[in-house]
């Protein structure tokens, strides 16, 4: 259910807070250090204002910003784990909360582009999940495609958490992958500008509904002298309805109560519209156990490394040249 300014921990489930962090204007390493201090200060203030909160989420790019002229430079990149994530870990341990943070991560292979990474830190100060963005926002983003799959970890109140990053949420197969691995609360951290505001809302709801899981999503908010970032933190129920919807205000804290057991129960007890089950058991009324092969060509082709669209040879944009990244396979920005 939605939170009417709730401050306490629900008897079952947990309270989440999603921070519509102001889009950072970052021109130097000092600006990044300032952002980290601001994030930590905000985490502690949120815990003080909402004593029952157990999970606090910060959006994509909140640590290092979106200075596209510098975001690939060594000065702007961080390691995971590293001294900056240790600061986040210390804050989570002090506040006794789970935290979700965004890091543009230096690639261990210096000949390849950096990763766009999200981490979950538990109340003991341990990184319990590390995710590298699988689907960078082509053709704008130069991040190397993630190589860690879609991990799932235990969270508060019986939750099983997964994180996707921004454009990942537009890929329905990725939400299904998280659910297939047991996720019942799917987190989305984003740095979208207003061009896809409606689609953001739509996909947060559809990812919840198609997979019978909660979604908790938060975007940067404010203006960076180029784009406006829409905020619009959103918490969706496992039936696809919106429980809480934020506005476009920087610093807005979107809170809501989440009951993972209700999503788990729906997965166990629903017949109609239990679509994540039906995908692998189609027609089980007529055939015991149903048909296990969905017969979907694109899944077979994707698994075989043969995925190709009928119009692919005629597509106009298939590399990063339009944004100054002529794709050669080498490292940009060194």
Swiss-Prot record:
GO biological process: one example: putrescine biosynthetic process from arginine
E.C. number(s) listed in UniProt: 3.5.1.49
Domain CN hydrolase residue range list: 14-260
Annotated keywords: Hydrolase
Function: Is an aliphatic amidase with a restricted substrate specificity, as it only hydrolyzes formamide.
Entry similarity comment: Belongs to the carbon-nitrogen hydrolase superfamily. Aliphatic amidase family.
Protein name: Formamidase
């Amino acid at each position: 259910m939605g939170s009417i300014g709730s401050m306490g921990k629900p008897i079952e489930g947990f309270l989440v807070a999603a921070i519509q962090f102001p889009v950072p204007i970052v021109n130097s390493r000092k600006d990044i250090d300032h952002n980290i201090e601001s994030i930590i200060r905000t985490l502690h203030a949120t815990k003080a204002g909402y004593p029952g909160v157990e999970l606090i989420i910060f959006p994509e790019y909140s640590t290092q910003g979106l200075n596209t002229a510098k975001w690939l430079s060594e000065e702007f990149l961080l390691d995971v784990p590293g001294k900056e994530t240790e600061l986040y870990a210390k804050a989570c341990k002090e506040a006794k909360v789970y935290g979700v943070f965004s890091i543009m991560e230096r690639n261990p292979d210096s000949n390849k582009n950096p990763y766009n990474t999200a981490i979950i830190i538990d109340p003991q100060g341990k990184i319990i999940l590390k995710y590298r963005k699988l689907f960078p926002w082509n053709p704008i983003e130069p991040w190397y495609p993630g190589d860690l799959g879609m991990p799932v970890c235990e969270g508060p109140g019986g939750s099983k958490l997964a994180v996707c990053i921004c454009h990942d949420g537009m890929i329905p197969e990725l939400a299904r992958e998280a659910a297939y691995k047991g996720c019942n609360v799917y987190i989305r951290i984003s740095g979208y500008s207003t061009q896809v505001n409606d689609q953001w809302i739509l996909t947060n709801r559809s990812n919840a509904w198609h997979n019978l899981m909660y979604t908790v999503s938060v975007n940067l908010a404010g203006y960076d002298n180029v784009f406006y970032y829409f905020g619009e933190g959103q918490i969706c129920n496992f039936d696809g309805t919106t429980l809480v919807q934020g506005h476009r205000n920087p610093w807005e804290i979107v809170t809501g109560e989440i009951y993972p057991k209700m999503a788990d129960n729906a997965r166990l007890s629903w017949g109609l519209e239990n679509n994540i089950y039906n995908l692998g058991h189609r027609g089980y009324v007529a055939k015991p156990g149903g048909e296990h092969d969905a017969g979907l060509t694109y899944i077979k082709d994707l698994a075989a490394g043969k995925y190709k669209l009928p119009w692919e040879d005629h597509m106009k944009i298939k590399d990063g040249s339009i944004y100054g990244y002529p794709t050669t396979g080498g490292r940009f920005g060194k």
